[in-house]
């Protein structure tokens, strides 16, 4: 199995630092968390059960349908696009290596061990990575982080004291917007009086003009 790890690192041609984190951190037990720079952690993702994440094929189809142009672009779009590219490339290399091992390893038991290891361990990690970055691009990073925290609280709460259904990611943005709107404004400010509009100073009008250009 150590030989398999070494071959995997050598064959993984992802060119950036994030890819090195993915391969080296997970395979050699280094304390490197590929989610830290995005405000999450491996532990936070681990609250989600393994069957929560779609298959790699479904996630790749989703990434291609939604973000193919950006992923194929030579431009730097966002850190999430970059991490998504690297996760896809690492999965391609994993599949290539697994196919090669399956075709060249004579011992059936060893061959099954390699295939199962890739599908079970690395497959889950790739599914988590793909889901996280696709979700951040689709719903926004803050929404995804809020969802992970909400799910973690829900799953750790005894069944007798929690709602019957887990939080749903697609319903969080609407809730978040309403919450921020309620916190940020009062009804009085929403409808200023006519006298207030007439008494605006030139300085205030200039600042509003600048804001409207953003």
From Swiss-Prot:
Q: Which residues form the propeptide?
A: 186-214
Task: Return the GO cellular component terms, semicolon-separated.
Answer: extracellular region; host cell; host cell cytoplasm; host cell nucleus; T=4 icosahedral viral capsid
| Subunit text | Homodimerizes.
- Naturally occurring in which organism (per UniProt): Hepatitis B virus genotype A2 (isolate Japan/11D11HCCW/1998) (HBV-A)
Protein known as: External core antigen
Q: Where is this region: Disordered?
A: 165-214
* One MF annotation (Gene Ontology) recorded for this entry: DNA binding
Instruction: Recite the UniProt keywords alphabetically.
Output: Disulfide bond, Host nucleus, Host-virus interaction, Repeat, Secreted, Signal, Viral immunoevasion
């Amino acid at each position: 199995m150590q030989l398999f790890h070494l071959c995997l690192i050598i064959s993984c041609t992802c060119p950036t630092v994030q890819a090195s984190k993915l391969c080296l951190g997970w395979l050699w037990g280094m304390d490197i968390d590929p989610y830290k720079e995005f405000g999450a952690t491996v532990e936070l993702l681990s609250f989600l059960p393994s069957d929560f994440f779609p298959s790699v094929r479904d996630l790749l189809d989703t990434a291609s349908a939604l973000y193919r142009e950006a992923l194929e672009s030579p431009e730097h779009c966002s850190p999430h696009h970059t991490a998504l590219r690297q996760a896809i490339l690492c999965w391609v290399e994993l599949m290539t290596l697994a196919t090669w091992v399956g075709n060249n390893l004579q011992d059936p038991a060893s061959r099954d061990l390699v295939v199962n290891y890739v599908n079970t361990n690395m497959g889950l990690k790739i599914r988590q990575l793909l889901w996280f970055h696709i979700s951040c691009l689709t719903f926004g990073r803050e929404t995804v982080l809020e969802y992970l925290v909400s799910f973690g609280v829900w799953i750790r709460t005894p069944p007798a004291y929690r709602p019957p259904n887990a939080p749903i990611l697609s319903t969080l943005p609407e809730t978040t917007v309403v919450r921020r709107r309620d916190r940020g404004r009062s009804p009085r400010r929403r409808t200023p009086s006519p006298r207030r509009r007439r008494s605006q100073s030139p300085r205030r009008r200039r600042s509003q003009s600048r804001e409207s250009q953003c």
